[in-house]
Amino acid sequence: RLSLTPWPSKKKVRVDLTVYANYAGAYTPTRPLFNVVVSTVDPSSLEPDFLETIFHEGSHLLFRYEGKWRESIFQTFEAGSYQMKFPRHLWHVSLFYLCGQVCKEEFAQIGIKEYEMVLLTRNIFKSYQSDELFAVLNQYMQNGHTLSATTEQLLGVLESKTNN
């Protein structure tokens, strides 16, 4: 629902569990085939954030190239007159945050109240992180904004950080 891209009905997703899966412990090549690769010896594989990692990596299929989320960022940026470089990781930090927040809410329902999302525990895309950016994504999650309005607000937050 959050990506606005339906799961492909005839697409199989291969998941490979391996000892080493790069510096991050997981990755997802999306071209030519979609494949999730996850390390089983990464320290996080024994923690609840392992589930978030699987969810995040699988969600790359929904936040893929030419997907609605990435296209919205690109089109909004191109149509605007932003005084900053194109934020090429905005789609990915959004994916991290949305997956992390969904997992946090689901974990809370089963009694895991102190869960902190991978984006924060591993300081991923730290330069993008801000309370303002997270507030915009939270509003989007609560159906408070359309994707285009969310994209405009996200770019506005990043531009104000750049110019301060």
Model-identified regions with their sequence ranges:
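Auxiliary, metal-adjacent structural segments of Zn-dependent hydrolase domains
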Residues: 1-29, 91
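Short acidic alpha-helical/loop segments enriched in Asp/Glu that coordinate divalent cations
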Residues: 9-15, 64-76, 108-115
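Active-site recognition of the HExxH zinc-binding catalytic motif
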Residues: 48-67
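Short, flexible loop/turn elements at secondary-structure junctions
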Residues: 17-23, 38-43, 59, 95
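Pan-zinc metallopeptidase signature
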Residues: 112-164
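Short helix/strand-bridging catalytic loops that position acidic/His residues to coordinate divalent metals
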Residues: 33-46, 70-86
